[in-house]
A protein has these predicted regions:
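Membrane-embedded alpha-helical bundles of polytopic integral membrane proteins
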Residues: 1-184
């Protein structure tokens, strides 16, 4: 529990100024976290130094460059180009890589890169400084309320094999808590 609290405090110290000031500070932080997140995800699959991994890293950087351009509608083309490049690697190196390797690499771009980019995009909106905090407060509130509700009254396991400590009561408590924080 102490490790979680210390990690949370460090995260707030780094994240709060980036979210408040936005701009290049938040942009650089999101790009950095996207690259590290992709690396960590690809490392699990043993692909972090492979051509598929390099394709994911390059796609992440290009996606962010286009995201901040005057006309960012082309950023989705990066996703399509990344998929085509990964499939090309798959075909020309067959049977070195499996289809699941493509999935790991492409999933990192979608799940890590694009999702973090939405934080930057949200911050750029009118009143974005408040909206982006709402995302974090709701997420942290959900985790906190789910944890304490589950510890206090959780009896019905939600997914015993996948996550043995999570309960249905905790999930409901998290949703109610996040909703309450969002309303406040």
């Amino acid at each position: 529990m102490l490790k979680r609290i210390i990690s949370g405090i460090c995260l707030v110290i780094i994240t709060a100024p980036a979210l408040y000031f936005g701009g290049w500070f938040l942009y650089a932080l999101c790009l950095f976290i996207s690259l590290v997140g992709n690396y960590e995800l690809l490392r699990v699959a043993g692909l972090e130094k492979s051509p598929l991994g390099i394709c994911a890293y390059v796609s992440t950087v290009v996606y962010y460059i286009l995201l901040d351009s005057a006309d960012n509608r082309y950023s989705m083309l990066v996703i399509v180009a990344a998929f085509l490049a990964m499939m090309t690697i798959y075909v020309f190196t067959f049977p070195k890589y499996k289809a699941e390797n493509i999935m790991w690499s492409f999933f990192g771009i979608i799940y890590v890169t694009m999702m973090l980019a939405y934080i930057y995009e949200t911050r750029r909106l009118d009143n974005g400084v408040y909206l982006v905090w709402l995302i974090f407060v709701s997420s942290w509130g959900n985790d906190t309320f789910a944890y304490f509700t589950g510890v206090l009254i959780g009896k019905h396991k939600m997914a015993p094999i996948l996550s043995p400590k999570k309960s249905i009561e905790g999930a409901i408590g998290g949703i109610v808590g996040a909703t309450a924080l969002g309303v406040i």
